[in-house]
């Protein structure tokens, strides 16, 4: 479009000079970073408009750095240097700053200067989508003090207690921290400074053994991943919270109070490692869920079907959700046969001895079981659910099962005459994205790998 406008009339007039600057700025704002930079050479009017046009900087839209032109510069710093030049050449606002393939290696001080600059220039989205280890512990404190910021996603950065206590991101609605270093006190301060927060994603944040989310009255989605040493998750006074996702291990004390809209929880991981980074698990850590959560309608569990201890935990977990309607159970059994410890093996009459569970008797309508390989123990658990779930409408099993095995399951006793059995082969799961999960009424009813995020 810009190239067409630049074509002179038959009289040699510059048609671009006739256009208002607001229109030129609008044209530039609709182009990618590289295209906009190339367009400004067409006319001095475009160059003038460029200076006042908001810069949407996405490194996927930048040309690949030329190799070999400057031998003294390491190749991994070339893209970071291009980012520095782009910010320096454009004095206007920078509403979008998104990095997917830029490493801070050798340029940490430059990255920290970017963060200060972005906070001062009205950034609305700052997303470091590159590999977390590429961020090299850059300090990101200034971003939490940005009053214009709406979306913040950090990789392996640092947030100091002083920076977190100065958080004043009044418009921030989405915060993602991946392998970021932050203290428990710093997390509390950061949350207090983000009153509009709707989504909080914590992935392997260093320095935290207790996650406490209190008085986050706008929070809708909380994600917690990869915390083998996590001792406690506490959610209090979160009236809008609807989903708690991640791989939440039962070795943590889980307390949820004041979250009346919480309807989806998972994955709750029943298989508990008995060591933490080579050390014996501290006494009293295996605490699990503290009190019933009646609002939850959708629950996802990760379990080893072949282990009696795991199944006891999984069944006891069901008792905390008296109004559960949909249950997802994903196997974490190895793909190879393991000789079971006879003291921890599922015996033939194990499920017959289980006491009645309220949600199975009255409310459970949908069950989805998944296992990457044939697992006899999973079939026994499926038979248990079919025999106990009186209002079951639908059960889907994703596994490699023979026709004979499917027929045996169909012939098992079913407490619900309306129950429908569906068998599927195992499907590859896609990488986790917020967009994919929030688009589903049931966040576990899709091909997104929530457990492996």
Name the predicted role of every residue range.
Residues 252-308, 320-323:
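Extended repeat-based solenoid scaffolds, especially LRR ectodomains
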